Amino acid sequence: MGNSFRVDRVGMEIKREVNEILQKKVRDPRVQNVTITDVQMLGDLSAAKVFYTIHSTLASDNQKAQTGLEKATGTIKRELGKNLTMYKIPDLIFIKDESIEYGNKIDEMLRNLERKD
């Protein structure tokens, strides 16, 4: 029971820190418009799925952001090591968060339905 609380807390802390690191420490223009939306930790804290959105709908920008995040992983982990009191910093797996786009499509469909009425 107590362990799941710790896992959630570590995930929230990593989300906050990674957003800050991307803003202040990573100089790569490919990740300028990236926002971390969620972090899901493995139960043993060995890895973190880091979900992100990008403020662009271009597929090329999405690919550039993914590449930029992967290139910045070393810097991000190093900064996490300075800022977090953890024995081992988890491996970071960056995944594009599709839920916001999906929600926007649903909203648009609902608006279109309202117009037809």
Swiss-Prot record:
Query: Pfam families this protein is in?
Result: RBFA
Can you state the subunit structure given in the record? Monomer. Binds 30S ribosomal subunits, but not 50S ribosomal subunits or 70S ribosomes.
Q: Give the protein's biological function.
A: One of several proteins that assist in the late maturation steps of the functional core of the 30S ribosomal subunit. Associates with free 30S ribosomal subunits (but not with 30S subunits that are part of 70S ribosomes or polysomes). Required for efficient processing of 16S rRNA. May interact with the 5'-terminal helix region of 16S rRNA.
A GO CC term assigned to this protein in UniProt: cytosol
Tell me if Thylakoid is a UniProt keyword of this record.
Answer: no
Q: Which domain of life is it from?
A: Bacteria
Protein name stated in the entry: Ribosome-binding factor A
Origin organism is Streptococcus thermophilus (strain ATCC BAA-250 / LMG 18311)
GO terms in the biological process aspect are:
maturation of SSU-rRNA
